[in-house]
C-alpha cells in the first residue's frame, strides 16, 4: 500500500480530512517521484549486468552450488537461479516506486522461506544471493541512490534470514 493510500485510509477511518502534516508528508513523497523513477530505470537498464555480477559473486562464495549435485548445477538449474535474481530485482523496484516495503512483503516475502525449504534450496544461499544482488545493484548506482535502495534489499535479506 502506498504512503498516499495509507494516509487516505487513516483519514477516512477517522472520518476526517488529512492533516496538514499528512499533506506535507504526501507533498514530500511526491517530490521524490522523479528520483525514484530514475533509480528504477537505472536498475532496469542494468539488469543483465547486475544479475551477471551477482551470480559470479555467489558462485565464488558457494562454488558447490554449481558443482555436480549442487542446486544450480546444469544449465536449467542455473537459469532458474538467474530467473529468481530478476524477480527479486523487480521486487525491489516495486518497493522503491511505492516508497514502502509493503509490496515486497505482500508479493514476495510471505512464505518464501517455506518455499525454498520445500524445494531443498539452502536459505543461507538465498541470503547470500540477495546480498550479492544488492552489492551488484549498488555498484551501478550513485552513493545517494544507493542509500535509497539499500533498505529494500536489507528488508528481503532480514526476512529470509529470520
From Swiss-Prot:
Magnesium found in the keyword field: no
Gene Ontology terms describing biological process: photosynthesis
Membrane topology, record value: Peripheral membrane protein
PTM comment, free text: Contains one covalently linked phycocyanobilin chromophore.
Binding of (2R,3E)-phycocyanobilin, residues: 81
Subcellular location: Plastid, Cyanelle thylakoid membrane
Any one GO cellular component localisation term in the record: cyanelle thylakoid membrane
InterPro entries tied to this protein: Globin-like_sf, Phycobilisome_asu/bsu, Phycobilisome_asu/bsu_sf
N4-methylasparagine found at: 71
Record key words, sorted: Antenna complex, Bile pigment, Chromophore, Cyanelle, Electron transport, Membrane, Methylation, Photosynthesis, Phycobilisome, Plastid, Thylakoid, Transport
First-listed, main subcellular location of the protein, grouped into a coarse class: plastid
Family: Belongs to the phycobiliprotein family.
Job of this protein: Allophycocyanin is a photosynthetic bile pigment-protein complex with maximum absorption at approximately 650 nanometers.
Family annotation (PANTHER family): ALLOPHYCOCYANIN ALPHA CHAIN, PHYCOBILISOME 32.1 KDA LINKER POLYPEPTIDE, PHYCOCYANIN-ASSOCIATED, ROD 2-RELATED
Annotated protein name in UniProt: Allophycocyanin alpha-B chain
Amino acid at each position: 500500500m502506498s504512503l498516499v493510500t495509507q494516509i487516505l485510509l487513516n483519514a477516512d477511518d477517522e472520518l476526517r480530512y488529512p492533516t496538514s502534516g499528512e499533506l506535507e508528508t504526501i507533498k514530500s513523497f511526491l517530490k521524490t517521484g522523479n528520483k525514484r523513477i530514475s533509480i528504477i530505470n537505472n536498475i532496469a537498464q542494468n539488469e543483465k549486468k547486475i544479475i551477471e555480477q551477482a551470480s559470479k559473486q555467489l558462485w565464488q562464495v558457494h562454488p558447490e552450488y554449481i558443482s555436480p549435485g549442487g542446486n544450480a548445477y546444469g544449465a536449467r538449474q542455473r537459469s532458474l537461479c538467474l530467473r529468481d535474481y530478476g524477480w527479486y530485482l523487480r521486487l525491489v523496484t516495486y518497493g522503491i516506486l511505492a516508497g514502502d516495503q509493503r509490496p515486497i512483503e505482500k508479493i514476495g516475502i510471505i512464505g518464501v522461506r517455506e518455499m525454498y525449504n520445500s524445494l531443498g534450496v539452502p536459505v543461507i544461499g538465498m541470503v547470500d544471493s540477495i546480498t550479492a544482488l544488492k552489492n551488484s545493484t549498488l555498484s551501478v548506482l550513485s552513493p545517494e541512490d544507493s542509500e535509497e535502495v539499500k533498505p529494500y534489499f536489507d528488508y528481503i535479506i532480514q526476512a529470509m534470514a529470520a
